[in-house]
Amino acid sequence: MKNKGKLCSIALASVFLVFVFLILISAAASAAQVTKIGTGYDPAVYGNEVVWTNGVVIHLYNLTDRTDTTVSSSGASSPDIYDNKLVWCDESSGTPRLAVYDIPTATKSYITQNVDQYSKPAIYGNRIVWSANDSVYLMDISTSKQTKIGNGSNPDIYDTKVVYYSYSEDPEADMAIRMYDINTKEKITVTSSGDPNIPHIWGTKVIWSDVYNHQGYIAMYDTSTKKTIDVTHQLDTDPNGNEYGASTGTHIAIQNDKIVYNKCVDDYEGKPGVYVYNISTGQSTLVYKYPEEVYTTPEVYDNIVVWGIDKNYVNSTDDNEIYLCNLAD
C-alpha cells in the first residue's frame, strides 16, 4: 500500500509538472506571437509595411528590418496603405484634405476638393475612395481625375469595385450596402437587411457590420455565388436564457481568406478580444484576449494581424499601443 501511495504521489507530481510546463510553453508561445511595435492609433498593413498615426506623425514600420520611419503630418488620421503609397486624412493646415505619400521618393501631394473632417480614405492600386458630406468620391492618382460615384459614406475599394453605405440611393431600401463598378459605372444593392454599415471588399467577398442590435454582427456576401452568410452571431439566447451575439461589429477587415474583428463582450459566443475568421473553414480563432468593453481596430494582410485601441474609447496613454501578431509563427 505504501509503494502504491508513493507511485500515486509520483504520478500526480509528474502530471502537475507537465501541466505547469504546458502552461509555460503556452504563455511563451503567446508572448512570442504578439509584439508591441509602437504607440498610436488606426493601424493598417500591406506586405511588409505597417502604418499608423499618433496624431502628430505618420509611422511606417518595416516588418523585415524593424525600422520605424516617420512622416511629419500634424492632424493626421485614418491612414491606409497599398504597395508603395500611403494616404491619410490631414488637417495640419486647418482645412481637411487627403495626403498621398509616395514611399520610394518620400514625396507628398494633396487632394483638397470634397474632403471633410470625417473623410476616411481607402486605396487600391492608383485609386483612392473616400466620402464627404454624404457623397462618395473616387480619385485616380495616375490621371488626377476625381469623380463623384455615389451618395453615401464609409467606402472601400478592391480592383474595379467600390462598396459603400447609403441611405438614399436605393428607392426600395432605407439603408443599404451598395457596390459600384468603375468600368461599367453600374451599381447594385448588396444588402438592405437590418442596419448594415462599414462595408469592406476583397476579391468576390463583401463584408459588413449589421448594427441593428448592440455592437452588431458580421455578414458576408459572395458576388460569385450571390449568397449571404452570417460570419458571427446575431443577437440570440444561449441555453441558459442569457443574451449573446451582436458584439462583433465595431471594427472589421478582410483580406484573402481571412476576416479580422473585435469582440467586446464575454458571452456564449466567446471571450472578448481580437479574432481572425477563416473563410474556407468557417472557424473563428481568438488571437489576443482583452477585458470586456475594449474596442480594438484589427487589420490583416496574409498572416500578419495588427491592431490598436479605437481612439474614441481610449481612457489613458496606456491604451494606445500598436500590436502585431504573425499567425504563421
Residue ranges of model-derived segments:
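Residue position within the beta-strands of beta-propeller blades
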Residues: 50-53, 86-89, 128-131, 162-165, ...
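Sec-dependent signal peptide cleavage junction
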Residues: 21-33
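Blade-level signature of beta-propeller repeat domains, shared across WD40, Kelch, NHL, RCC1
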Residues: 295-329
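Repeated scaffold domains used in trafficking and secretory/extracellular systems
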Residues: 39-47, 75-83, 116-125, 151-160, ...
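Short glycine/acidic-enriched loop and turn motifs that connect beta-strands
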Residues: 57, 91-95, 167-172, 211-215, ...
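A short loop-to-beta-strand structural motif that recurs across blades of beta-propeller domains
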Residues: 56-61, 96-100, 134-139, 174-179, ...
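A short beta-strand motif characteristic of beta-propeller blades
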Residues: 32-38, 67-72, 107-113, 144-150, ...
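Short loop/turn segments that connect beta-strands within beta-propeller blades
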Residues: 62-66, 102-106, 140-144, 181-185, ...
